């Protein structure tokens, strides 16, 4: 009888372990990578830092080779002060700004730092990277990399651009299947778990085939092969956790029936829906429209896609439990023409906008439509008349 009880107990433990592992897969660790031109691999975006000749106060500085320097600060929550000091110096008084100092250990001073030499210089640009920074966190030191591009044409156009220099990537298991996972610090602030209503402030995650560009916002949830998971991302990007989402509250969104695809994002993550009769469901929360699409065929059977994107706060909406939120988006769209006098010549540009001020593009067969838009110019006395193609901006 005791043996039978042991067998039943072991079976119960085994079933419990299986049930637990099916719902929550634990920490799945990723590997850190750095690259000089990381944007070619991970996409991402740059951030512009203001530079000044004013020396910061109460900061120990390194020895310089010239009389003037430029100073900047990079904001990151990974150091106690919330900012990392950066200095640009140059080898000679008339040369490029080819030396960069950064507070790589986050101690608030730069007198203990060595200069990073530029790997490329042009007439106006200087390139650095990947530049290593080490954050001290509870579990020990964490390595992070940045790439820099300094533009120095004149006082009006001078700026320091900062790019991602590293990312996390590796193989994870989702519902028993191996998939590639990539984490990107999209807003370049040193952390990998940022969630936001504004897409530019949300970090990015890819789960699927290696090399896939199907990118989602880091958020509370992520959909993988039509299954909704709760997502947890380590602040430093070292691991993720996926748990099958349960007891999630949903509401509906109502769109014009012409909309064939709709996407919206926020702290819940990014959700893309193939629309049916203008109705789709989303988890309860606040969102901003990411894009909409309308697909049509012309009388010759050619496929066309109109896409609205680049929404401001006018594209914000909220989904409430068991309620329906209606959005008037899509058609009609408005085409505008702008004229600007440049010297003795006029320059013309077009813009196509949706009802919420979003940009609108038109593609056919997946390719941008070139020379679709045309402008007719005619002199007041009628002696001159010509049709000009207007390229997409």
Report each predicted region and the residues it spans:
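Calcium-binding acidic motifs and repeat modules
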Residues: 25-268, 274-381, 386-393
């Amino acid at each position: 009888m005791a043996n039978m009880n042991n067998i039943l107990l072991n079976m119960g433990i085994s079933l419990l372990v299986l049930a637990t592992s099916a719902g929550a897969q634990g920490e799945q660790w990723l590997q850190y990578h750095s690259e000089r031109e990381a944007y070619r691999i991970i996409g991402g975006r740059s951030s512009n830092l203001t530079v000044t000749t004013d020396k910061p106060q109460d900061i120990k500085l390194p020895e310089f080779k010239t009389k003037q320097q430029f100073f900047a600060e990079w904001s990151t929550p990974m150091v106690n002060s919330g900012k990392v000091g950066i200095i640009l110096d140059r080898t000679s008084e008339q040369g490029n700004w080819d030396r960069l100092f950064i507070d790589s250990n986050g101690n608030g001073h730069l007198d203990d730092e060595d200069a990073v030499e530029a790997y490329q210089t042009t007439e106006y640009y200087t390139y650095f990277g990947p530049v290593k920074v080490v954050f001290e966190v509870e579990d020990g030191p964490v390595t992070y990399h940045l790439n820099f591009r300094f533009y120095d044409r004149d006082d009006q156009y001078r700026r320091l651009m900062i790019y991602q220099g590293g990312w996390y990537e590796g193989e994870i298991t989702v519902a028993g299947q191996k998939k590639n996972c990539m984490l990107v610090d999209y807003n370049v602030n040193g952390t990998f778990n940022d969630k936001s209503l504004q897409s530019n402030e949300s970090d990015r995650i890819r789960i699927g085939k290696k090399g896939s560009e199907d990118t989602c916002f880091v958020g509370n949830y992520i959909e993988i092969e039509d299954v909704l998971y709760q997502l947890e991302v380590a602040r430093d990007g070292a691991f993720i956790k996926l748990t099958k989402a349960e007891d999630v509250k949903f509401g509906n969104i109502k769109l014009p029936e012409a909309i064939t695809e709709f996407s919206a994002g926020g702290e819940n993550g990014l959700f893309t829906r193939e629309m049916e009769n203008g109705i789709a469901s989303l988890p309860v929360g606040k969102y901003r429209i990411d894009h909409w699409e309308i697909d049509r065929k012309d009388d010759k059977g050619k496929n066309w896609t109109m896409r609205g994107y680049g929404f401001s706060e006018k594209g914000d909406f909220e989904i409430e439990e068991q309620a329906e939120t209606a959005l008037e988006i899509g058609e009609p769209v408005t085409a505008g023409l702008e004229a600007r006098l440049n010297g003795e010549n006029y320059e013309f540009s077009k813009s196509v906008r949706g009802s919420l001020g979003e940009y609108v593009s038109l593609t056919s067969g997946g390719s941008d439509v070139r020379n679709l838009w045309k402008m007719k110019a005619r002199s007041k006395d009628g002696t001159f008349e010509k049709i000009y193609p207007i390229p997409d901006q």
